[in-house]
Amino acid sequence: MKLLNRISLVAIATIALFSCSSSEDQFIGTWTNECEDEVMGLKILPQKELLTLNDDNSFVQSFTYFADSQYDTLAVVSVNGSWELVNNCLEMSYDTESIVVKCDDEDIIDIFYDNLLGNIALNNEELEKAHEEDSQYGIQNATVKDNSLISKENLEDEDGEVIYTKVN
C-alpha cells in the first residue's frame, strides 16, 4: 500500500510539473504563484491551490507543495491539515500561522509556511525561534546549514540582533 501511495504521489507530482497555474490564480496575500520557484536550491512547485471563504469572512488556504532538492526530499503538504509526507520526511506539525516539516536527513530542513503572509522559509532552530518570538514579522527567511544565501536583507531588533534574514 505504501508503494502504491508513493507511485500515486509521484504521478501527481509529474502532472503538476506540466500544469503550472497562471498568474491569474494568485491568492490573497504576498505569495506569487509561479510554476517554479527556486529557494536555496529547493524547488517548490505549487500543485494545488484552494481558497475557502467562511461566513465570518475568514478563509482557509490549502496548498500542496512538491519539494525536490539536493536532499532528494519529496514532501506533499497541505495547510488545511490534509497532508502526507513521503520519502525521508518523517513528521509535520502546524498551527494557524506556520507549517514545519522535519526531514530525516543529515541536514534537518524545516519548511515554514506563513499562513498570513504567504512566505516560504527554510531553516531550523534560529528561524523557528524568530517565528516564536516575533511572529508579527512573519517568516521570510531561507538558509541552509552552510549559511550560504542568495541575497539577504537583515531585520534587526533595537539591540542590533538579527531577527530574521529576508532572501530576495
Regions found by a protein language model. Give the residues of each.
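Sec-dependent bacterial lipoprotein signal peptides
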Residues: 1-18
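Lipid interaction determinants
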Residues: 20-168
